[in-house]
């Protein structure tokens, strides 16, 4: 039946390290919370203090997320009212831009499709998390929606972003729209 159940455990908290080996199914029947990291944690057999520190921070955030204390999928984002209101406002503005781009250039790969492919589960934060990951925002800190947006802007390549201008100014043809979306 499993050691934990035999010793009287009433619930399990399991951490998936995505390590090499055999993963046995949980047949205990106990309520189980599974903690997984979105991020690559590195070689667990090679001890490096900086990597260990980073993994401890990420693991702490993953645990808080698993128990509903944080939002986000890739980034640890505050779940309080202010940060959640900012996430909802960001999502509404993002959706309006998405709609405008789809209407002008229907063949453009839109972010809603890309986000499905990225498997980011928090719909309001997914666009912000995806771009933050794309530019290399550090996943270890604790963020609010606003501070994650600011971290994204600090790492942003504004030259790359300027290529998207024609999508919003109505000057781009379908080929230029597709090129901008892929860059």
Regions found by a protein language model. Give the residues of each.
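Patatin-like phospholipase
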Residues: 1-183
């Amino acid at each position: 039946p499993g050691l934990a159940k035999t010793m009287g455990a009433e619930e399990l908290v399991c951490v998936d390290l995505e390590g090499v080996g055999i993963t046995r199914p949980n047949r205990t029947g106990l309520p189980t919370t599974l903690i997984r990291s979105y991020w690559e944690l590195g070689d667990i057999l090679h001890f490096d203090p900086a990597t260990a520190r980073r993994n401890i921070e990420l693991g702490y955030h993953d645990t808080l997320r698993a128990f509903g204390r944080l939002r986000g999928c890739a980034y640890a984002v505050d779940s309080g009212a202010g940060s959640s209101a900012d996430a909802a406002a960001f999502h509404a503005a993002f959706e309006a831009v998405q709609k405008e781009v789809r209407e002008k250039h229907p063949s453009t790969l839109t972010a809603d499709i890309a986000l499905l492919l990225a498997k980011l589960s928090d719909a309001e934060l997914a666009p912000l998390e995806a771009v933050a990951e794309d530019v290399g925002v550090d996943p270890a800190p604790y963020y609010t929606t606003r501070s994650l947006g600011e971290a994204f802007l600090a790492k942003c390549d504004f030259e790359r972003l300027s290529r998207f201008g024609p999508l919003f100014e109505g000057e781009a043809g379908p080929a230029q729209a597709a090129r901008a979306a892929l860059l």
